[in-house]
Structures are given as structure tokens and as C-alpha cells.
Amino acid sequence: MCAKKRSASSNRWLQESLKDKYVVQAQKKGLRSRAWFKLDQIQKSDRLFQPYMTIIDLGAAPGSWSQYVTTQIGKNGHVIACDLRYMSPLSGVDFIQGDFCNKQVLQAILQRLENKKAQVILSDMSPNFSGKPEIDIPKSMYLVEKALKMCRYLLIPGGTFIVKVFQGDGFYEYICSMHALFNTVKIIKPDASRSRSREVYLIAKGHKI
């Protein structure tokens, strides 16, 4: 019975993907995933990325967000991407494989920054989903809390943090934690985000020290 349910769910996801206009466009444009369009829509509404910026992309694989920001910050900008999974090389992206909370990995990021800090930190991370919100939401909150913690070490005063969060237990408490570190926090759901998904994006501006 469980196998049948998983099979039906997988088939439904596959059929949705085949019909998804963003999946089709991503394939035509040679993009790494449809998530590229989510960040593009965020950029068009908020104009967060500028030439020469240094940007850190946490949980970057397969690399669509890193791929996008390289088009916005120019050749003199700097993208540092980090993920537990391997990510195939991208022009203009400095990739570090590992857990960014690991001391050695964090040190590697700091070395790439050359004693500076980033203007923007991105996090589009998701856990491996089980399909059970009571399991998946806490796993997701654990990841976004780790990403928020990194802002203390890696983000400039006045900097911006963009993070994907799944609505559920701990969501509003997390927003309160963000308000403690940033001047403003905005909730946005890009059109490219599937309507049935619990995911939203939080844009936090004005990093406090």
C-alpha cells in the first residue's frame, strides 16, 4: 500500500514537472533548475543584486541561484557557493563542498572572502522530504536556523539575507529571530513557486551588528 502511494505521488510530481512552464523554460535556456526563475522574480521586485557584489550561496547545488547571480553582479563580482553535495563547475562561482557549519568549511569560506564579508547571503536549502509535515518542517527549520546563524559571521552590516522557509511550526518564531538581526523582514512568494507548496521566501535587509 505504501509503495503504491509513493509511486502515485512520484508519478504526479513527474506529470506536473513535464507540464510546468518553468521546467520547460529552464531546459530550453540550459539552466540548472526552475529555481532560477524564483530568484529572477525576487530580483525584479526588490533589486537586491548589483555589480561588484560578493554573494554567498548556502545549499547551492545544483547551482541555479549561483548561476543567476553571476548574471547580475558582473565579472568583478564574487560568488561563493557551498553545499554538502557536489556541484558541477560554474564560471564565476567559487564552490566549496561541505557543511558550512563545520569549522574547516567555515574557515574555507572566510579565506575566500579575504577578511571581508558578503553583501548578500542566499539560502534556497531544502531537506530530503518524507512527505510528512511533522517530520519535514522541523528538518527545514533546522537548516534555515543554521543559515541565519551564518549571517553573524559572514554578512556585512546593512547586508541582505534571502532564505526559503516552509510555513509550519516555528515559522513565526523564526521571523522574530530575523527581526532581531535585521531592520526589515519581508515575506514573498514568487510566481515560480508552486501554489500548493508551503515554501515562501523571506527577504531580510539591514543586517544589525
UniProtKB/Swiss-Prot annotation:
Keywords: Cytoplasm, Methyltransferase, rRNA processing, S-adenosyl-L-methionine, Transferase. It comes from the Bacteria. It is found in: Cytoplasm. SUPFAM superfamilies: S-adenosyl-L-methionine-dependent methyltransferases (SSF53335). S-adenosyl-L-methionine binds at residues 63, 65, 83, 99, 124. GO terms for cellular component: cytoplasm. Disulfide bonds: none annotated. Pfam families: FtsJ (PF01728). Specifically methylates the uridine in position 2552 of 23S rRNA at the 2'-O position of the ribose in the fully assembled 50S ribosomal subunit. Belongs to the class I-like SAM-binding methyltransferase superfamily. RNA methyltransferase RlmE family. This is Ribosomal RNA large subunit methyltransferase E. The lineage of its organism: Bacteria, Pseudomonadati, Pseudomonadota, Gammaproteobacteria, Candidatus Palibaumannia. The gene is rlmE.
